[in-house]
C-alpha cells in the first residue's frame, strides 16, 4: 500500500481495495458482490446514459480516539436514496441491503479509514443507475447499485473558516415542482456553470433563490442554508430543496442547546437580519458564510466582519463532529459502531 499522508489529504478520489455491487433484473435485486475493479461494462443504450436514470448518496465513516469506526446516519441515506429512486422510477434499493453494503465496504477497506488525529474521514459513495437498454423515454428494466469508498481530508484545510457567496438570479437550481428534492446527478450537472461563474468572481459558490418568484432563499451551492438570529435556527422550507441529513441533525442539536428552530419560507430581505449564516452538508458539516453579495442589486449581507465563524455555528459544528468521532455520547442513535 502506498504511504498516505493522512494529514494532507484533499477532497478527491483515491483508489481503495474493494467496492460493493448489486444488480436488479427480472424484477428482483440479487446478492451483494465484492469487486476489486474500478470499472464495469454497461450497454451503450443504458437509460442512465441517455435519460438520466441515476441517483447517488454521500456519507462518511470516522475513526474515533478509541480506534473504533463509526458510520453516521446511514439509515437516513438509505431512505433518501429510495426517495430518489421513486422520483426517477428506478427500482428501490432495500434499506437493509444498503446498510449491509456500507458496513461491508467500510470493513473491507478498513485500512483506508484515516486515523483520528488527522481530522480526515472515509467518504462513502453509493450510486444507483439504470443499465437496461432503452431507446424510448421510459424506465429501464435492469439496474445496478455500486458503493465505493475513498479517504478524504477535512473540508477546511486552514481550519473552520468563513467564505463569501453570491446571489445571481440568472441561474436556477431546479424547477419549482421538479427534481430538486432528489439527489440525482442532473441537479449537479445543472449547477456546474453557475458554480464556475461564482468561482470566477471570487466566491466559494452561488446562492440560489426560489425559481418561481426569486423571492425566497433556496439553497447555497449543493448545500442547505441556515441562519441564526435571536437564539433561533432558521432554515428554508421548499419542495425544491434536497432534505439534508446534516441539517436535520443540526436542527435537533440546536433545540438541545435551547434554541428555537424554524423551518419556513425565508425572504431574501431577511438575510439583513441574521447574526450568523451557514451552508450545511456531508462534506463540511457547516460552511460558515462570511457575506452574501447580491450580483443584481449590489446589496451585500455581511455576517462576519472579522472573517471568523459565529459562536453558534462553531458550537454546532464542534458538537456534531464530536458525535461523529465518538468524542461525545450519541444520544440519538445516529452512529453505527462497526465491530
Model feature map: region roles:
Residues 115-129:
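Extended, Lys/Arg-enriched charged tracts that mediate electrostatic binding to polyanionic substrates
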Amino acid at each position: 500500500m502506498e504511504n498516505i499522508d493522512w494529514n494532507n489529504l484533499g477532497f478527491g478520489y483515491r483508489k481503495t481495495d474493494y467496492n460493493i455491487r448489486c444488480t436488479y433484473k427480472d424484477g428482483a435485486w440479487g446478492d451483494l458482490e465484492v469487486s476489486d475493479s474500478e470499472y464495469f461494462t454497461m450497454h451503450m443504450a443504458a437509460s442512465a446514459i441517455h435519460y438520466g436514470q441515476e441517483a447517488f448518496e454521500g456519507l462518511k465513516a470516522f475513526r474515533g480516539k478509541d480506534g473504533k469506526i463509526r458510520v453516521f446516519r446511514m439509515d437516513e441515506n438509505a431512505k433518501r436514496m429510495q426517495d430518489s429512486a421513486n422520483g426517477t422510477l428506478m427500482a428501490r434499493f432495500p434499506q437493509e441491503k444498503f446498510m449491509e453494503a456500507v458496513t461491508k465496504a467500510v470493513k473491507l477497506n478498513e485500512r483506508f479509514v484515516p486515523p483520528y488525529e488527522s481530522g480526515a474521514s472515509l467518504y462513502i459513495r453509493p450510486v444507483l443507475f439504470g443499465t437496461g437498454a432503452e431507446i424510448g423515454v421510459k424506465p429501464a428494466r435492469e439496474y445496478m447499485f455500486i458503493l465505493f469508498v475513498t479517504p478524504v481530508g477535512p473540508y477546511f484545510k486552514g481550519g473552520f473558516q468563513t467564505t463569501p457567496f453570491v446571489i445571481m438570479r440568472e441561474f436556477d437550481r431546479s424547477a419549482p415542482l421538479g427534481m430538486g428534492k432528489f439527489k440525482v446527478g442532473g441537479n449537479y450537472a445543472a449547477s456546474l456553470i453557475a458554480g464556475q461563474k461564482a468561482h470566477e468572481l471570487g466566491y466559494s459558490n452561488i446562492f440560489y433563490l426560489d425559481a418561481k418568484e426569486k423571492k425566497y432563499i433556496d439553497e447555497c451551492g449543493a448545500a442547505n442554508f441556515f441562519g441564526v438570529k435571536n437564539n433561533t435556527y432558521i432554515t428554508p422550507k421548499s419542495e425544491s430543496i434536497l432534505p439534508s441529513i446534516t441539517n436535520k441533525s443540526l436542527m435537533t442539536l440546536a433545540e438541545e442547546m435551547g434554541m428555537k428552530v424554524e423551518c419556513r419560507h425565508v425572504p431574501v430581505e431577511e438575510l439583513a437580519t441574521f447574526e450568523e449564516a451557514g451552508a450545511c452538508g456531508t462534506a463540511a458539516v457547516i460552511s460558515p458564510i462570511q457575506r452574501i453579495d447580491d450580483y443584481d442589486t449590489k446589496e451585500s449581507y455581511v455576517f462576519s466582519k472579522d472573517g471568523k465563524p459565529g459562536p453558534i455555528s462553531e458550537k454546532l459544528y464542534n458538537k456534531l463532529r464530536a458525535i461523529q468521532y465518538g468524542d461525545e455520547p450519541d444520544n440519538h442513535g445516529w452512529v453505527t459502531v462497526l465491530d
